[in-house]
Amino acid sequence: MKVFVYLLVTFSLTNASPLRNRFNEDHDEFSKDDMARESFDTEEMYNAFLNRRDSSESQLEDHLLSHAKPLYDDFFPKDTSPDDDEDSYWLESRNDDGYDLAKRKRGYDDEEAYDDFDEVDDRADDEGARDVDESDFEEDDKLPAEEESKNDMDEETFEDEPEEDKEEAREEFAEDERADEREDDDADFDFNDEEDEDEVDNKAESDIFTPEDFAGVSDEAMDNFRDDNEEEYADESDDEAEEDSEETADDFEDDPEDESDETFRDEVEDESEENYQDDTEEGSEIKQNDETEEQPEKKFDADKEHEDAPEPLKEKLSDESKARAEDESDKSEDAAKEIKEPEDAVEDFEDGAKVSEDEAELLDDEAELSDDEAELSKDEAEQSSDEAEKSEDKAEKSEDEAELSEDEAKQSEDEAEKAEDAAGKESNDEGKKREDEAVKSKGIARDESEFAKAKKSNLALKRDENRPLAKGLRESAAHLRDFPSEKKSKDAAQGNIENELDYFKRNAFADSKDAEPYEFDK
């Protein structure tokens, strides 16, 4: 493909200007331009031919360049690298080095300290001596003497105190240390700062959370983060609710009617037992001084208690038990329906698999159709190449015919000279008459000979002009034959080849003044 593009561009750039400047009026000798000029009846016709030819060549050059540029752009795409913006690099970079450097940059106190680090890093990269690591910045990372002494506190601090006081002091000291660390982390991570907020958003997008990422994040920042991701947490709670409903459905599926009866029976027993306890307590208060009299033990019977209840209370209890039983029955039916849903999902999955198989078969049919179209295009390209070769052979045959006509003109000129010699031997009157006729015929023969030469030169010139383009057409056809899968480029090139072949069929052997201008499809 690159070779084909190079040939097209080279032909258009190297042959266009010589074709335009072919005719040189200042040339002293009898040139092809003079012969071509004499083949026209008037100067206006000759100038019209020149203008038309220059216009056709310009159109040809534009046509070739318009076809070559898209191919060039395909092979050499434009650079689409992002802008080297420092802020966007620190915030949006996803490679390991960039992300580590972003965290390292946040650890410096001010911009000057980081610039010092950046300068050392760049110098090490330029010299290629070694990699920059954390040991290069030990001096910057050193803590003040007070904090070092605070961190180096050991058992000697508590030697003079009792053991319990030592333990309490250690716990207070550890709590103070953790509080100081949290304050430092909160001070480093300001959620109102745009850079830290963008950092959290970028990490949320890439899903790279670790416990260390939220070590210094304040409670307010975490609440805002949960609000932003409320939908995700809602989805998780919905999944948990579905699991609970499935477990409840399994429990009710075992024996929902027994469950409802037992629940009702337990409630009635509890209520009856409470009434019974109240009665026994009242009786014991009345007869608490009578120690000899024994309290008869009551035997609780829920069914009898229910039968002995007043009529309105009996109806109320019956209605409540029916309502509970109906509710439990509805819940069990809903749970059973939810359990049956996986079977429907399996059927839907099988239907989707069948649809996918049908789509795959359809894609196979389309692929076979594309292969058939590619083979047909290949045959058409070969046919176009054969027609181009036939056109070139026909041009050579016309050139041979022109040479034959030139030989016939020379033969006529020789016969005229012989007639002139024979006329000199005859009488003066007849000789002069024949001499005039011979001179006239000689002039006619000379004119015919010059016209034949001009026609031959014009045909040779036209063949030279058409030969590179015919060669390009053959190469284009061969390219399409080798790469039939490039369908879009193939269709466009095939249409241009057909138009160009039609033009050459109509005008390849016509006289220059009768040739029609070459027009390309835009």
UniProtKB/Swiss-Prot annotation:
Biased amino acid composition, Acidic residues: 109-125, 153-166, 173-200, 228-261, 267-283, 358-374
UniProt signal peptide: 1-16
Name this polypeptide is given: Aspartic and glutamic acid-rich protein
GO cellular component: extracellular region
Region called Disordered, residue ranges: 72-497
Biased composition (Basic and acidic residues): 72-81, 93-102, 142-152, 284-343, 375-397, 407-453, 461-491
Tissue: Component of the acid-soluble organic matrix of the aragonitic skeleton (at protein level).
Disulfide bonds: none
Chief place of localization: secreted
Coiled coil: 319-465
Entry's localization field: Secreted
Keywords: Coiled coil, Secreted, Signal
